[in-house]
Amino acid sequence: MKIRILSLGEKPPKWVSEGYDEYKKRLSKSIPLELIELPIAKRTKTGNPKLWMEQEAKTILTKLSDSDHLVILDVNSKIISTEELAEKMQNWKFNNPNVVILIGGPDGIDQSIKNIAKEKISISKMTFPHPLVRIIIAEQLYRAYTILEGHPYHK
């Protein structure tokens, strides 16, 4: 199984990259984790968020293939626990070896992308800075992995 994280946004601060890299390193021996940073559409004060999301959707589609199992992070979807994420990872391992987790832009994810997603999950009803979500997802993937392996990290 390989997991790619597609993240729309500006280049994050150094501390975000360092935090993400720590969990990527911990997972690297068992689950390759790749972060692909995608630019957001240019915003203006009088612009249209729907058009921005449509532009971002076109960029997202260039990074997806038919064999990808697209999982989007969506605040309006079911909040899952770490244990539920571990169950999903177990399923992905056997059924969907190319997993792509999408972190949307500041205005959300275009409906055209939501329509092709295989799964929609939420990590919280709270709002987080998008760069921080990279670290949260990487850590939760690592934590879920340790649950599956019986490692004491989760306790």
From Swiss-Prot:
UniProtKB keywords: Cytoplasm, Methyltransferase, rRNA processing, S-adenosyl-L-methionine, Transferase
Residues the record lists as binding S-adenosyl-L-methionine: 73, 104, 123-128
GO MF, one annotated term: rRNA (pseudouridine-N3-)-methyltransferase activity
GO CC term, one of those recorded: cytoplasm
EC code(s) of this entry: 2.1.1.177
InterPro entries reported for this sequence: Alpha/beta_knot_MTases, RlmH-like, tRNA_m1G_MTases_N
Catalyzed reactions per annotation: pseudouridine(1915) in 23S rRNA + S-adenosyl-L-methionine = N(3)-methylpseudouridine(1915) in 23S rRNA + S-adenosyl-L-homocysteine + H(+)
Location of the protein in the cell: Cytoplasm
Subunit architecture: Homodimer.
Its job: Specifically methylates the pseudouridine at position 1915 (m3Psi1915) in 23S rRNA.
HAMAP family reported in the protein's UniProt record: 23SrRNA_methyltr_H (MF_00658)
Family under the similarity heading: Belongs to the RNA methyltransferase RlmH family.
Entry protein name: Ribosomal RNA large subunit methyltransferase H
Source species: Francisella philomiragia subsp. philomiragia (strain ATCC 25017 / CCUG 19701 / FSC 153 / O#319-036)
Lineage, highest ranks first: Bacteria, Pseudomonadati, Pseudomonadota, Gammaproteobacteria, Thiotrichales
Chain's gene name: rlmH
